[in-house]
Amino acid sequence: MPIVERYDGVMEIASAQKDVRETFMGGFAGQLVSAIVWCASGAACTWHSLRLGELVLILGGFFIFPLTQLVLRGMGHAYALPKGHPMNALGMQVAFILPLTLPLVIGIAALHPAWFYPALMIILGAHYLPFIFMYGMWQFGVLSAMLIVSGVAIAMYMPIPVSLGAWLTGTLLFAFAFVGRRVARSDIPTS
């Protein structure tokens, strides 16, 4: 478990952020699991149908956090913040952004099926904005901006192939998994 530094009974923000980076490896496992889900959705859309791709992403999305915890456990790593940690509440709030915005994505996709992935990319980008504070990593701002800008660009200028957004998002998440891991590892003293 991460070491929690307390000052006068209150945790410093930087210490709380470091705990999040260390516990979740800078988002490594979560980004990796998410990348796999997005690429599986892209594959389902590319080689079967958009409808199957949508189902894979929506249903798979509900399993991202439990699978992330499983991957962390499998790596012999802590898989959750300690009970009472100040970032637990923010993490829970951030986790609900995507499921609560799914009706919007489904409504948009009902009118413009090719906008399913771009709409979800934009919402995923917004979902990552609080990660900047929670992890104390500006890199999540870059990921967020790339997802939002790409989602808008694909919706407006490149709606075909329909699966492009899924493949691009999977690729970005995969790359940022290793960016986050590197940032988290740089926090660990090498002595």
Residue ranges and their predicted role:
Residues A35-A89, A95:
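Selected alpha-helical membrane-embedding segments in polytopic membrane proteins
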Residues L102-I148:
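Membrane-proximal helix-loop-helix units in multi-pass membrane proteins
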Residues V20-G30, G84-M92, A109-W115, I132-G141:
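Short, amphipathic, aromatic/basic-enriched membrane-interface segments that mark the entry/exit
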Residues G42-L55, I106-W115, A155-S163:
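Helix-coil boundary and interhelical linker segments in multi-pass alpha-helical membrane proteins
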Residues A16, Q69-G84, A126-M134, A177-R185:
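C-terminal ends of transmembrane helices
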Residues M1-T23:
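Short, Lys/Arg-rich, polar N-terminal cytosolic tail immediately upstream
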Residues S34-W38, V94-V105, S144-V149:
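Core segments of transmembrane alpha-helices
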Residues F140-S191:
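Terminal transmembrane helical module of multi-pass membrane proteins
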